């Protein structure tokens, strides 16, 4: 749940912080924002994140504000421990994306494609927050149950008659694409149907063409889900 800026006192009181520390936190935040920003125009987005009994404060200014400030993470000592290289234009949320028992930070974005987001993991070894490189290239990602693989979906033009889904995994805080399903139903395409490809060393190799008529494929999401769930291991093997 997001808290408005005027709710910061209540939020931090739940963490057993007094009013003086609230003022100090506000001052800490002000120091990293460009001069002239009007805090009263829109509320700030603030939430607390707990990882292994340690609490953090995630904060950024409202997406409607003309002067955008990158997302910040502070500890309860008021130290700024992470500044993200970007801004969550559609807000942020916490979720256990990789299902490892730790909450992660999703930064959602407003785009023409839809489903674009960034992801921040907490590294238990270094005790630091780290961004996942390339995550924004995989819109609307879904984890394949019982595996460490994920697949995405995005429109590719022609009123959604063309679309793509990528199979990928995350290693060392980076995303690696290993497969693609490409639906091509647009009349202007030389070939219509569903094309399945392996990605090896960032090069695409078509391995299957399921011929279909031109048009909108109503079963595309079901096809994508079933195919990746039943075939992802074939793409994981080199």
Predicted regions and their residues:
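Sec-dependent N-terminal signal peptides
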Residues: 3-13
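Acidic, small-residue rich beta-repeat scaffolds with periodic aromatic anchors
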Residues: 16-52, 149, 153-238
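Beta-propeller blade termini
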Residues: 44-49, 88-97, 138-148
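Coil residues (strongly favoring Ser/Thr
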Residues: 47-48, 63, 80
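Acidic/hydrophobic-patterned starts of short beta strands in beta-sheet-rich repeat architectures
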Residues: 53-58, 98-109, 148-153
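Structural motif
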Residues: 67-70, 113-121, 160-168
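A short beta-strand motif characteristic of beta-propeller blades
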Residues: 79-85, 130-133
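Short coil/turn segments at the loop-to-beta-strand junctions that recur within blades
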Residues: 86-91, 134-140, 182-187
């Amino acid at each position: 749940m997001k808290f408005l800026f005027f709710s910061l006192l209540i939020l931090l009181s739940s963490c057993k912080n007094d009013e003086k520390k609230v003022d100090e936190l506000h001052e800490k935040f002000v120091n990293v924002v460009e001069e002239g920003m009007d805090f009263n125009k829109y509320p700030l987005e603030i939430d607390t994140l707990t990882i292994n009994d340690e609490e953090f404060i995630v904060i950024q200014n409202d997406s409607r504000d003309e002067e955008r400030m990158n997302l910040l993470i502070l500890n309860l000592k008021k130290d700024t421990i992470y500044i993200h290289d970007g801004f969550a234009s559609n807000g942020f949320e916490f979720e256990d994306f990789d299902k490892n028992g730790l909450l992660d930070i999703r930064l959602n974005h407003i785009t023409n494609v839809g489903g674009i987001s960034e992801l921040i993991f907490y590294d238990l070894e270094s005790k630091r927050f780290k961004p996942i490189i390339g995550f924004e290239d995989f819109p609307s990602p879904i984890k394949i149950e019982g595996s460490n693989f994920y697949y995405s979906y995005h429109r590719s033009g022609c009123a959604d008659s063309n679309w793509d889904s990528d199979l990928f995994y995350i290693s060392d805080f980076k995303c690696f694409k290993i497969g693609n399903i490409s639906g091509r139903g647009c009349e202007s395409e030389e070939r219509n149907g569903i094309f399945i490809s392996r990605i090896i060393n960032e090069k695409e190799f078509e391995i299957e063409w399921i011929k279909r008529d031109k048009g909108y494929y109503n079963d595309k999401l079901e096809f994508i889900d079933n195919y990746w769930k039943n075939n992802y291991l074939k793409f994981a093997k080199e």
